[in-house]
């Protein structure tokens, strides 16, 4: 089993997706005109498990790199145009258009109305749009963004859309998984939350109080996040886990909030069974995370986000579900 890693890990900042592994990665970033101070400007598709059918969250990240390091494009909006390439042998067919809105990692700066290059320590995130794909095969996204003092830039990246999702998706029934909880015995605390290393306590025990199976039996809405805050190759998993904790504190009576750690034993590459049930594997045979799933009281998945989610948008969707 592979863990899909973003191209940004090559640059030292896997900021967009903990997913992809070498030459069989379906997403292909393409360098574009230069960025600030002549740096190389690139875009990457952060989403995975894209399939034909209903509109789904599509996420891209844009970064500039030079000998001094990496900066990320943050804030504001950009326009996206999609083209269907099929197997790549024919003429590209124009597809949907969309506007991508910036979503920052939880706890980082969300400010700024215009796209701006930022230090990843200050702001990091993606641009999200809801897009529907009508055919399986290779697609291309062309993103155009107006950057103050830099002008208009257009970047392209290709990605694969499959006939069906490989992972649980909206409309599917949630799997009645017996994930580890604070009451689990015979397991190290780090298997419950990877931050509980070297005697450290589980930092968010309230997110580990029940199993997905028990929560489904309660017939209540569920928000379950699959992430590994310590071993994630991106800088997104920890903030997203904190974001779920914040939602749990703000809406304690609206849903059951669950965090599932990816690794049972990271050093031996042993994945927790619950994580294996839900996020392994995509069409490339890779485990992908982080993923947040919203499950209705009827046990059906209503929405999912990966790798990033907007807590305000999640809260709005949660509020629409019956208690």
What do the predicted segments below correspond to?
Residues 21-24:
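Bacterial signal peptide processing site
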Residues 193-196, 203, 212-233:
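Short active-site neighborhood of thiol/selenol oxidoreductases, capturing the structured segment around
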Residues 234-251:
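Typically the conserved alpha-helix immediately C-terminal to a functionally engaged Cys/Sec
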Residues 259-289, 294-298, 320:
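Thioredoxin-like thiol-disulfide oxidoreductase module
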Residues 1-10:
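Bacterial N-terminal signal peptides that target proteins for export
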Residues 167-168, 188, 294, 301-323:
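Thiol-/selenol-based redox modules, centered on thioredoxin-like
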Residues 16-19:
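C-terminal motif of bacterial Sec signal peptides marking the signal peptidase cleavage site
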Residues 26-197:
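Contiguous segments within soluble domain cores/interaction surfaces
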């Amino acid at each position: 089993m592979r863990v899909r890693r973003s191209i940004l890990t090559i640059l030292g900042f896997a900021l967009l997706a903990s997913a992809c592994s070498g030459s069989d990665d379906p997403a292909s970033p393409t360098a574009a005109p230069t960025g600030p101070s002549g740096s190389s400007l690139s875009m990457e598709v952060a989403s995975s498990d894209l399939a034909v059918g209903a509109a789904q969250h599509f996420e891209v990240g844009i970064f500039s790199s030079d000998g001094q390091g990496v900066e990320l494009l943050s804030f504001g909006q950009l326009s996206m145009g999609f083209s269907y390439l099929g197997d790549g042998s024919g003429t590209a067919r124009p597809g949907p258009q969309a506007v991508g809105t910036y979503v920052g990692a939880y706890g980082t700066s969300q400010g700024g109305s215009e796209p701006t290059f930022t230090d990843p320590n200050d702001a990091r995130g993606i641009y999200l749009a809801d897009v529907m794909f009508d055919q399986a095969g290779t697609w291309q996204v062309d993103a155009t963004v107006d950057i103050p003092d830099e002008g208009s830039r257009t970047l392209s990246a290709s990605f694969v859309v499959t006939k069906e999702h490989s992972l649980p998706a909206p409309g599917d029934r949630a799997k009645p998984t017996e994930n580890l909880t604070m009451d689990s015995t015979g397991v190290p605390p780090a298997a419950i939350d990877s931050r509980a290393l070297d005697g450290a306590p589980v930092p968010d025990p309230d997110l580990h109080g029940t199993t997905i199976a028990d929560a489904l039996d309660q017939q209540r809405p569920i928000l379950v996040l699959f992430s590994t805050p310590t071993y994630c190759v991106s800088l997104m998993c920890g903030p997203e886990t904190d974001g779920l904790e914040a939602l749990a504190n703000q809406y304690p009576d609206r849903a059951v909030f669950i965090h599932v750690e990816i690794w049972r034993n990271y050093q031996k590459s042993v994945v927790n069974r619950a994580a294996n049930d839900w996020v392994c594997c995509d069409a490339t045979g890779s485990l992908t995370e982080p993923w947040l799933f919203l499950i209705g009281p009827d046990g059906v998945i209503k929405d999912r986000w990966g790798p990033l989610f907007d807590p305000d948008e999640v809260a709005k969707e949660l509020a629409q579900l019956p208690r």
